């Protein structure tokens, strides 16, 4: 009825229109929501597709194996489209806000906590931390296109305060002491937060420099050619920068700095040319400094400080020590300028350093001492640091160009330096003596050339002052005379007059006796060398000396060397892993100075290249294989050839001595390496059981129990609840856990029954008259639990070891008497033969021990037997019947009351354990058959 009345209701036009509008609005809203959803879905799909394309591009880059200089990255621009951007582009620095960084410069005031220095260091740390987190291509984009980064690094390397460089003031001594006290560490002034932030800045700058020196990382790499041009053209690394890096970080990260400098010079050889130009610039500044000082009538100490003389010397010394290959440019620059003429100001860095060392610094030092009363304090503060650094510069040059060359010729080692060329011995000695002559003559040339330009004051100074000889001071520190003697002994072409002149110059004059001794060395050196060569090459050692002297050539060979064992032992006391020959070479290089050798071994970077490349475990000269330790096989062959008894005895003694000496050497080497012998304990075969740990067999584990526990277990066996306790405790008194732990080794001892029977049979003839029955009682209880179907006296071992017992009864027959052999064979026979042979044993016992026979057999009746299963009861009853049949002729000898039986049970249960404690450790420590000498008699007693 209601449905029929609805059409009759008429809506007004207005209501109808509103209704339609609402319906239309709902449709529009639904369509809008659907469109928005569809739009979002489409946008997400597009983004996902673009991200997939970006990931695919990254995978292709990794698979292509191209450097970042040849690859690009897909980027979504502002319009939502993909756009290609090179991996090295300004986009990553300027246009991208995510990777934008702007650095501020480091000022000298930032070394101290003043004003805004703390805030500026915080900004620097935050920018450096974000830079180090960037990917490889973004990091390199900042290095190339971000100028603020390069300006920051340059300012930091220039103005950051050095920690190890001694800043010397030639004007005031108080400032010297203050500066030296402040140079012990990087930061000492300021609060803790400021010092920590400054140390963090110091580390992060170094990490940035190290990353700039790396050509390859996990996230990418740069091709070698592009990288070499990149760092050189963009001036990411320059020679002044490298000098500053070495002076700042060489004392903190020496190995990292050496690898960084070496890799930079290897990738870009143009830096060698720049290094030569840099040395020429240093020599020019020293020339100008000398001219400005000599033209004045006053000692301008401030001018000497403002020209950074100490800074130049310190940086040069540190750089050459870190990078010895740079000494080639320094030495070549010196030789080039000497050819042009040293007096015109082009003498090279080495010439000007000798001039300042011998004349300028002593003049200023002397006048400064006159001006102040503290003469003692001024001398070390001004003169000594410069002296040490200048001498170190000359030592690195001598070592790299001459000393190492000579060692390489002697040891036949290939030259590791790429720039060095192999030179003969004559050329090495000629260059070295010419260098010494030029060093001594250059200062005189400068003094003669500048005589007209000097002021009257300096003319007086040069006339009155006594110059310091740089070679004499070098002799006091590095022992130049040892190297000169070595050259003279090896090379006969050296002029002896020049040798005596330089020896007198360094304070080592050659006497007339030494001259007479020295002259034959020139001729004998070559003959000795050639004789050694001929003797080593020929199979027989009986070559005539005339043949050896025919080939006279200045060739080096492995001469017989006498090693200083005392100094070698001193070095090996701190470094026991080193070989004698390696330590000998180190002592030879450092002029037999043990302290220098130890310091060099502590810092491996200070070792010369030929010692680094040498095997440190060498104990003898590798070039002389004939001098090895004789093996015993060579001496044993001599014994077979000889017929006389005397000869044979001597030959045999030599073999024993060589073998004993070789064994003693092996023992001493093993004792030095304690860790090797100690680690052998923890191999796979190591057993941590009680038997291995204690040294006793597991069968003797009962003696580790206390006597109180043994008495408790014996009392429990005699109580009325014995039948209920046997399932939980074994017949030997152990718990199930102990029986499980100790049951495994018992199966591994199949000869246990025979050993115990041997002891029982010996005790019948040697020991007391009541020991054997007590041991038989202890053997019976553990036999019922594992195998209840066997008789208690037939087989003391489990059923698994019947076969090895049948195969091994013949071993003790040769060492023991015939009576114990019969007793051994009884428990090892098969069960069918055992009932016939078993009554023989109690008959023997009754004959020898008729009075004490009833004691051991009484406890067998009250002792309970395990009843783990009802099926075993019939077998146990059969065993009891067999035992009673065996004991029938002995039953009339047992008329004793029950109280005596209980006392005897307790005594008998205690006595076998005491005898067991005394008897059983001995067979475990001795080999088989050792009981034949009566080893168990003492234990039975």
Curated annotation (Swiss-Prot):
Protein name from the UniProt record: Activating signal cointegrator 1 complex subunit 2 homolog
Native species: Dictyostelium discoideum
Superkingdom of the source species: Eukaryota
Coiled coil, from the record: 16-64
Location of the region described as Disordered in the Swiss-Prot/TrEMBL record: 531-553, 612-665, 695-941
GO biological process: rescue of stalled ribosome; ribosome-associated ubiquitin-dependent protein catabolic process
Matching CDD domains: CUE_ASCC2
Key words of the record: Coiled coil, Nucleus, Transcription, Transcription regulation
